[in-house]
Amino acid sequence: MPGTGRRRILDLLAQLPITARVLGNWEDSLWYGVRKELDKTRPSQRYLLRHCQYVLEEISLEEIELLHNQPLQLHRQFGDLTVGISHHLPDKNWGRELIHTGAQEDFDRLVTNPPCDIAVYGHIHQQLLRYGSDGQLILNPGSIGQPFFLDAQLRKDLRAQYMILEFDDKGLVDMDFRRVDYDVAAELQLAKDLKLPYFEVYYESLVNGIHHTHHQEFLRELAQKEGYDRELDAWLKSGND
């Protein structure tokens, strides 16, 4: 969320041998949103609520509860190396502390409590490699669907981002930041076919790398123009999922 995945993405994930899951901010937003507990007056929160309504067309409350019932941080051992995994900070899955210009003391929180040798986090939608104060490795794999760039030239490349870490009995063999092409036109057509709310916002993210999810006036005008406000208000008043 936001996107076309819904049932399809859950079914795909169920086929993969996933051994580590952590709680992200979007899972929190979905959990609160389906309970209609977000701010119903703020355009960005109404944007989230309308997407929660959309998700509920295919995914049950029980499945959303399972998505939400994940730790903020976990650790895995690879030989002598301890790897910490979190969406953002160990005790907070939202905010701007870990953007690329973040304070060193905030990045050190990823590798000190509890201590680990390598920290992997998400949230900022940017591929990143940097170090803790004591030399620990801190990595971010980037974003598959909505990479973020401040630089206009870098923003021209919006391919899906991945990171592959390879370990052997001696330690970390390789770090591989990947970018993979996908059919953006096909995804946008699918979004149209599935009547994805706020299609214009999705288009801007996938095609131009511009993200409007916090642009209050833009979201307000779009919701009124396209009828998302009307659809959301009907759902909020219905008392039904």
Question: For each of these PLM feature ranges, what is it?
Answer:
Residues M1-E57:
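Core catalytic region of metal-dependent phosphoesterases/phosphodiesterases
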Residues M1-T4, W26-W31, V120-G132, Q146-F149:
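Active-site environment of divalent metal-dependent phosphoester hydrolases
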Residues P2, A20-N25, S86, I118-H123, ...:
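Active-site neighborhood of phospho(di)ester-bond hydrolases with catalytic His/Asp-centered motifs
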Residues K40-R46, G79-N113:
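Active-site-proximal segments of metal-dependent phosphoesterases and phosphodiesterases across multiple
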Residues E57-H68, Q73:
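Ligand-binding beta-strand-loop-alpha-helix segment within the catalytic cores
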Residues L72-D80, L129-G132:
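Short acidic-hydrophobic surface loop/beta-edge motif
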Residues T101, F107-G122, Q127, Y131-Q136:
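Functional cores that coordinate and move charged inorganic groups
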Residues S133-D241:
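Acidic, His/Gly-rich catalytic cores of divalent-metal-dependent hydrolytic chemistry
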